[in-house]
Amino acid sequence: MKFWLVSESSVAAPPHGERCHHGGVNATTEHAPVDAWGPDFLGPGFEARTLELLPDDEDDGAVATLVRHLPALDPGALPGTPTTPTFIYLYLHGWNDYFFQTHLAREISRLGGAFYALDLRRYGRSWREGQMLGWCTSLAEYDEDLGRALSAIRADQGWETELVLSGHSTGGLVASLWADRHPGALRALVLNSAWLSLQGSELVRTVGDPVLRTLALRDPRMSILDGWVDPARVFSITDGWLPERDGELPDPAWADDPYVTGWDINPAWSIKPSAPVRVGWLQAVMEGHNRVTQGLDIRCPVLSMGAASTRLGVTWTPESRSADTIIDADATARRAVMLGKLVTIARFPGGVHDLTLSEPPVREQVFSAMRRWMAAYVLR
């Protein structure tokens, strides 16, 4: 079996001790207040709150963390952002990842959305010392995280405002399964490179399941990819543009864009080349894939976005900046039509795994497509 599993945003971190513009390295020193809003490390206009959860099998103090965007307090809010939201937008991150995409929040707020993001248990803001990052044995465990988040959101926005759920990569799989189990709960589902199928051939996927089951019976916490690649050789889109590797910048106007300067990442929350991939967690993901294969019955409109091409691999190639290097984008598009009866597939030439981290023109194409689609299915 071959698994390409790095951070789902292809995230690499600055060296330990190097300050991130969002306060990344220091973000682990203080947790958000419990069941109350407090400042978030993303800066003015962003607040977070810790959501206490019931003890699970690990009994390690698992919590979730909800982040909200308040455009009125955000000096970077986009012109024309309305003061009264007309819908709720809840974002779920991917594997070895957390919410940091402030530009996504601002785009949604400009559309009239009340933007929230959820760092799931044992990820990002919710990770606590001694916990296995990202660990779960069933994706259904996140129902509690989502339930607690929605209770807090409804306390903010009321019960009449319609909900759009969004997910990136594994977060897209979690969101899809949740939407299937909760008919009538959503106005729409928006997916950014949702991980709906194990990358590689169908044979690899089929053989992988029984092997994983055997390993999981022996030791579900066993990590299967330790030392598999030198971290120094890993290509990460968040590193920014390196002229000695990437050559001349295609457009000088991009010089100050994070695509060139680098995205600000917390190294404790997005580990390079990857957090430990444990067989019990991977089995839980594959069980989710199997549910999608059987066909889901999501009742709301679904937008499934992905890159136009795939170049699986973790080391740099000229194609790495314009393709999905983490999952098979073609397989995702094929599987997406099995999510429900009304599914829109959008593919973006030049897009990377997290489409919102693509080069500036592609990013704008992604946001433009989202605006048009939401005008048709969400905005009133």
What spans do the regions from the language model cover?
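Short, surface-exposed "cap/lid" segments of acyl-processing enzymes
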Residues: 70-119, 127-129
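Alpha/beta-hydrolase-fold enzymes
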Residues: 170, 175-276
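N-terminal cap/lid segment of alpha/beta-hydrolase-fold proteins
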Residues: 26-82
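Catalytic active-site module of serine/aspartate enzymes centered on a nucleophile-bearing elbow/loop
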Residues: 342-380
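Active-site nucleophile elbow and catalytic-triad environment of alpha/beta-hydrolase enzymes
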Residues: 273-294
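Short beta-strand/loop motif that positions the catalytic acidic residue
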Residues: 298, 304-306
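Conserved loop-alpha-helix segment in the C-terminal half of the alpha/beta-hydrolase fold
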Residues: 311-347
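Catalytic nucleophile-loop/oxyanion-hole region of alpha/beta-hydrolase
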Residues: 95-96, 124-162, 362-366
